[in-house]
Amino acid sequence: MNTNQRIITIGTICLIVGIISLLLQIGNIISLWISHSIQTREKSHPEVCNQSIITYENNTWVNQTYVNISNANIVAEQGVTSIILAGNSSLCPISGWAIYSKDNSIRIGSKGDIFVIREPFISCSHLECRTFFLTQGALLNDRHSNGTVKDRSPYRTLMSCPIGEAPSPYNSRFESVAWSASACHDGMGWLTIGISGPDNGAVAVLKYNGIITDTIKSWRNKILRTQESECVCINGSCFTIMTDGPSNGQASYKIFKMEKGRIIKSIELDAPNYHYEECSCYPDTGKVVCVCRDNWHASNRPWVSFDQNLDYQIGYICSGVFGDNPRSNDGKGNCGPVLSNGANGVKGFSFRYGNGVWIGRTKSISSRSGFEMIWDPNGWTETDSSFSMKQDIIALTDWSGYSGSFVQHPELTGMDCIRPCFWVELIRGQPKENTIWTSGSSISFCGVNSGTANWSWPDGADLPFTIDK
């Protein structure tokens, strides 16, 4: 092969290689264009589930799932479903109470950023249960916790966090400015009721899904107050009870019916010689049953039951097993107020089962210490003091406090009945202990028809804290 032939051959090979390279580049461009077109078309269609991109810089826990993080992770968000909580079922048959949650907030608060709180309560939607609480605008073991024994101040707010978690600035959601409160879920949204303002002119602010929907002005100008536990929702309507008037004499009591946070009906109870405060309410077969605190003159607890039209009945728990604190020793009951040692009181609850009643109460008859659940099979209608079952919750030597009811609807549990539950506040600090603050943790139990335990689940914090010394 002469020189010219070699030149022609090399040129031909280079031309062929160049053409192949050009074709590969064109193919690459076409491939990228097709891929981009497919992605663009996919983004133009509605997505089955929303996604959010979360970028982390270290290994961490997110929503109780361990994530090994070195780059961006795409997390699919669960769709939120809305239903109407019917509230038409009866209470589940139970034989005892299983522990459900314990937040240990005072123990954790000795070293962590934990709110100073009182009046915690629990309420459940069809998706979750949350702990609601009234903060003092202060943290434990901090100087602003000084003097938080005071009930009503402009710094108090209603907040909530997932049940069982210690309430802190990092896991809590603001709900309302309030020194008295209630909250409940109708299946579509959270209703919150927060009362704040001066004693002689307080206002209840109603919010639905965080938006103000209505207000209630104090009608007696004597410390308007509400349940300090969950309100009740049935078939899209929610119900609560409020009190206005003396804490040691005849006051005024009103039931309110609300839909999506707006008041559609209210009535005042005709209840002479009755005293209703801090009612613990629950749904049962389409009606509302409330068991309350008589701070005026009774050792037993008053109740009110009403339907969705607010037609009501009133009474006192007849049992000689008395539920208030302070109270008389168990003895002869009364279907009206038991007047012996009945002044003052504490928020509490009971669950009615026909003629029988589960009574939650402190173990002490004079101080807020200890807690027990007692089953009196005839206690709703009979006045004797016999009972058939007792379950220990808090030992007599440990502090308790307020207690109240909440329920889990069939839409949450998958059961065909409404599960009864209760919470107990474990108050620590002033006025019984040598601290500058008053706060509390909480435990909760739910009714089961299987084995349960007798024990004590106290707060357990070692006091005083550093700030107290």
From Swiss-Prot:
Enzyme class, first EC level, given as a word: hydrolase
Cofactor: Ca(2+)
Chief location: virion
GO MF annotation terms: exo-alpha-sialidase activity; metal ion binding
Sites where the protein binds substrate: R118, R152, E277, E278, R293, R368
Source organism superkingdom: Viruses
Residues engaged in binding Ca(2+): D294, D324, N344
Keyword Ribonucleoprotein listed: no
GO cellular component, one term: host cell plasma membrane
Region span, Involved in apical transport and lipid raft association: 11-33
Intrachain disulfide bonds: C92-C417, C124-C129, C184-C231, C233-C238, C279-C292, C281-C290, C318-C335, C421-C446
Keyword check for Calcium: yes
Classification via SUPFAM superfamilies: Sialidases
Active site residues of this protein: D151 (proton donor/acceptor), Y402 (nucleophile)
Keywords: Calcium, Disulfide bond, Glycoprotein, Glycosidase, Host cell membrane, Host membrane, Hydrolase, Membrane, Metal-binding, Signal-anchor, Transmembrane, Transmembrane helix, Virion
Protein family per UniProt: Belongs to the glycosyl hydrolase 34 family.
General function of this protein: Catalyzes the removal of terminal sialic acid residues from viral and cellular glycoconjugates. Cleaves off the terminal sialic acids on the glycosylated HA during virus budding to facilitate virus release. Additionally helps virus spread through the circulation by further removing sialic acids from the cell surface. These cleavages prevent self-aggregation and ensure the efficient spread of the progeny virus from cell to cell. Otherwise, infection would be limited to one round of replication.
Name of the protein in its database record: Neuraminidase
Organism of derivation: Influenza A virus (strain A/Swine/Wisconsin/1/1961 H1N1)
Gene (UniProt): NA
